[in-house]
């Protein structure tokens, strides 16, 4: 804190400080961002033409809002980034539990402090991050948690009678005063607690149990919810829904390129080890798995398939390739399609299955997703390439076994026995002839997986390739 920062009420007044409602603060700072062209939500991709404009409208209109979306759609991250639209620091009366404005305190504690100390009332400064409070709505949340209750222990220790305002133990809403309060999974909040939210959303105040006193809070309130839960009759009481001014619907990435950018941004890939080279086509396969899972009828689409799935798969396949590189003493870490199959544990736990899916099993569905995604990626690169010589090799009894821990050099040697395979990888631009063994091996695996998807050859659970129908 600089020497010029006011530490008393008198110094704050002399500085010309002007307090303003938090929604005005957010609005004015947002306008400044828009005028300067700064990015509003750094790290949030794919929402530039959908979610972000709706959020901007809500903030400019000074609205409380709810984000409706499935899991893994950056709802919580968006809410936490709202703090970037707050002032860097904000003055409060020192010791206040409800962030009393030194120029307009709302609590008895704040009023007494000013009455006792006048312009010498000490103030402290809150960073913008301290002005954000978040609560996960669960059925066991109580009114005391959210709004507050009497505290007999505080009354006894302070020598107060229970009717004294100073005996209040404030809940999260009052403690978020002059800031942002976020509640995740709103439909899980019990109806009687939802009723308790009425006043704060419409009149901007709360009533503490047993007190005629009303606290005039200054808040932006934001919620998140699953769309199906939010629209289900009886999950949200109608008067509460009516008081939420704006609904903003989030979504999964609309194209593979955006999904890949998000996955690469979020995945832990920079590791203190061997150099890492992830082929672009491997990244595409990983991302397409998520897109296919979101269209798979055996997967419960009401639950969604989180963007965390491709992130976890990418991290796991890198670990699989890293393990192989260490064991084989290879210089570079280059993931292959086989490493995606080794990453299935990162897939199965992130899909909620329908009844038919439960019958087939998550493992089988995950393997089918890998095969289908590899086939789509191969088709994008192949474009009707001539693969007759490769297919004929397997039709004539040729077999190719590719284990997850096989060295890249050994794989390239083996792939060289299949007529035209390495040449096709070069022709398609997947791996030039002078590329590393790791990249050439990965490219050949993609081609073979594409042929499996096209049912021209078959693949065993152990990574063996042979003629179709075997």
Can you describe what each PLM-predicted range is?
Residues 272-281, 292-366:
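C-terminal helical "lid" subdomain and adjoining coupling/linker elements of P-loop NTPases
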Residues 349-393:
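Charged, amphipathic alpha-helical linkers/stalks
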């Amino acid at each position: 804190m600089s020497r010029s920062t006011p530490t008393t009420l008198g110094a704050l007044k002399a500085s010309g400080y002007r307090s303003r409602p938090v929604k005005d603060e957010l609005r004015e700072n947002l306008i400044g961002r828009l005028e300067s062209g700064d990015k509003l939500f750094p790290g949030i991709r794919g929402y530039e033409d959908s979610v972000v404009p709706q959020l901007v409208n809500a903030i400019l209109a000074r609205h409380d809002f709810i984000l409706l979306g499935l899991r893994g759609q950056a709802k919580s991250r968006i809410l936490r980034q709202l703090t970037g639209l707050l002032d860097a620091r904000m003055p409060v009366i020192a010791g206040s539990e409800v962030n009393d404005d030194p120029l307009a305190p709302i609590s008895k504690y704040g009023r007494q402090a000013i009455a006792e100390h006048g312009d010498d009332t000490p103030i402290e400064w809150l960073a913008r991050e301290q002005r954000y409070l978040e609560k996960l709505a669960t059925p066991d949340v109580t009114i005391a948690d959210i709004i507050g209750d009497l505290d007999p222990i505080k009354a006894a220790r302070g020598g107060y009678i229970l009717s004294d305002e100073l005996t209040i133990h404030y809940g999260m809403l009052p403690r978020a005063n002059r800031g942002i309060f976020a509640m995740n999974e709103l439909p899980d909040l019990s109806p009687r607690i939802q009723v308790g939210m009425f006043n704060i959303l419409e009149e901007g105040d709360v009533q503490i149990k047993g007190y005629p006193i009303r606290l005039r809070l200054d808040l932006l309130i934001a919620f998140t919810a699953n769309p199906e839960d939010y629209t289900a009759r009886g999950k949200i009481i109608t008067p509460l829904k009516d008081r939420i001014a704006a609904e903003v619907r989030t979504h999964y990435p609309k194209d593979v390129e955006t999904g890949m950018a998000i996955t690469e941004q979020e995945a832990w890939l920079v590791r203190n080890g061997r150099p890492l080279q992830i082929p672009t086509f491997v990244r595409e396969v990983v991302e397409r798995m998520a897109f296919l899972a979101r269209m798979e009828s055996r997967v419960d689409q009401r639950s969604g398939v989180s963007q965390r799935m491709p992130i976890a798969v990418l991290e796991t396949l890198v670990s699989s390739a890293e393990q192989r590189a260490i064991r084989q003493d290879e210089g570079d870490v280059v993931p292959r399609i086989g490493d995606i199959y080794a990453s299935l544990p990162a897939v199965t736990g992130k899909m909620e299955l329908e009844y038919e899916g439960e019958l087939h099993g998550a493992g089988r569905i995950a393997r089918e997703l890998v095969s289908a995604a590899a086939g789509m990626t191969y088709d994008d690169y192949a474009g009707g390439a001539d693969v007759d010589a490769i297919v004929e090799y397997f039709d004539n009894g040729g077999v190719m076994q590719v284990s997850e821990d096989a060295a890249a050099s050994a794989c390239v040697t083996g792939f060289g026995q299949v007529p035209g395979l390495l040449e096709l990888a070069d022709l398609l631009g997947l791996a030039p002839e002078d590329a590393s063994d790791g990249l050439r091996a990965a490219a050949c695996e993609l081609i073979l997986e594409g042929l499996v998807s096209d049912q021209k050859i078959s693949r065993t659970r152990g990574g063996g390739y042979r003629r179709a129908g075997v």
